[in-house]
């Protein structure tokens, strides 16, 4: 497992954010919801934006979804090339949710959330939803560190991967609009016909 430059800073930041050993009750429940379940609220928000959106907004959402898949693929590659232990594997700090002992850098949860958050923010007509997604992404990122399954640098890496993935996919927007968006529109129409017939 890799030891990052500035590892002492990474661990110091982690210990400053990580929850105390006696965390319980509502605080623990809130942190677990933030860490593990806001991703489902984001999915519901994206579905709502897709159904209610204009065709150009759905085309952009499709592009962002492709960027998210690319981001998660990059995470797999990064994890293979530069594996880094999770806090409980060191061990350091306190851990409150179970997790497999696998590489921590970057965080898949945070990468997914930040890719959609930046993506939604990037289209002016979806920016208000983007603000909500940014709050969700920030809370999820905090929760992953607070509950002891990620280091702060894992989250920072996720934010960078999210931006890079969006930048890499953006030049392919014309191809996505021409080839993939029509298929997505047919799926969209089929969903509406099925639900509202």
Q: Model-derived features: where do they sit?
A:
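Small-polar-interrupted transmembrane alpha-helices in polytopic inner-membrane proteins
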Residues: 65-80, 130-143
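Interfacial segments of alpha-helical transmembrane regions
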Residues: 44-74
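Alpha-helical transmembrane segments of integral membrane proteins
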Residues: 30-37, 63, 128-135
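N-terminal transmembrane-helix/juxtamembrane module of multi-pass inner/ER membrane proteins
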Residues: 1-40, 76-102, 180-197
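Membrane-helix interface segments
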Residues: 24-26, 55-60, 125-131
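Hydrophobic, aromatic-rich alpha-helical transmembrane segments
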Residues: 26-30, 57, 61, 65, ...
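Short helix-capping/hinge motifs at transmembrane helix termini and TM-loop junctions
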Residues: 52-53, 82-83, 147-151
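Membrane-embedded catalytic cores of phosphoryl/pyrophosphoryl-handling enzymes
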Residues: 97-197
């Amino acid at each position: 497992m890799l030891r990052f430059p500035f590892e002492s800073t990474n661990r110091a930041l982690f210990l400053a954010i990580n929850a105390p050993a006696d965390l319980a009750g509502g605080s623990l429940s809130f942190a677990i919801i933030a860490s593990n379940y806001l991703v489902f609220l984001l999915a519901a928000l994206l579905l709502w934006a897709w159904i209610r959106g204009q065709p150009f907004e759905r085309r952009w959402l499709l592009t962002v979804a492709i960027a998210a898949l690319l981001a998660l693929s990059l995470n797999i590659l990064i994890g293979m090339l530069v594996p880094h232990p999770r806090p409980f594997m060191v061990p350091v700090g306190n851990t409150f949710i179970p997790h497999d002992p696998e590489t921590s850098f970057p965080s898949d949860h945070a990468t997914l959330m930040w890719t959609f958050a930046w993506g939604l923010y990037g289209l002016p007509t979806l920016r208000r939803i983007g603000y909500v997604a940014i709050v969700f992404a920030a809370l999820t990122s905090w929760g992953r560190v607070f509950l002891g399954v990620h280091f702060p640098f894992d989250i920072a890496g996720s934010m960078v991967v999210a931006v890079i993935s969006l930048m890499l996919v953006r030049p392919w927007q014309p191809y996505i609009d021409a080839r993939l968006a029509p298929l997505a529109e047919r799926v969209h129409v089929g969903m509406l016909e099925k639900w509202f017939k």
